[in-house]
Amino acid sequence: MAKNNSELGEFSFIEKITENFEIKNSESLLGIGDDSAIIESSKLHTLVTKDLLVEGIHFDLSYTPLMHLGYKSVIVNLSDIYAMNGIPKQIVIGIAISNRFKVDSIQELYKGIKLACEKYKIDLVGGDTTTSQSGLTISITALGQV
């Protein structure tokens, strides 16, 4: 039987959903898995953007597949970086998950996130997870350079 995130434990849960993410950018010195990411600065300007997606407001899971939602949650941030003529480099993800979601479901969400990261050569360098009384909330911060 599939476990939910509270049964697995925070650190095991994070390791499970992010195990296949790889660092692609040389500026990303330390990625997900520690207290903080380490990103090397350059002479370029850093762009920072954040978008929050809340179930029932920004998406409806009755017709939005979780993999598509994961992809979309990354792309809405990257579009802000591209709008400033920048090159996206890293993302940080925060998710609030209710107990109705099993780990398998969240892994499906992260498949979409991973697909977007691979396509646009973005590094997932950190994040946070917490429980939610109802629904799913996704918060992504994207960093880029211009």
Residue ranges and their predicted role:
Residues 1-65, 84, 93, 111:
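Extreme N-terminal cap/leader segments of soluble proteins
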Residues 9-13, 34, 69, 73, ...:
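General structural feature for long, well-ordered alpha-helical segments within catalytic domains
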Residues 28-31, 77, 128-129:
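Short beta-strand
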Residues 34-36, 73, 97, 129-130:
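Short, flexible micro-motifs
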Residues 43, 53, 89-146:
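Glycine-rich anion-binding loops of enzyme active sites
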Residues 62, 66-70, 98, 102:
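Short secondary-structure transition/capping motifs
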Residues 66-90, 111-119:
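Small-aliphatic-rich amphipathic alpha-helix that forms the alpha element of a beta-alpha
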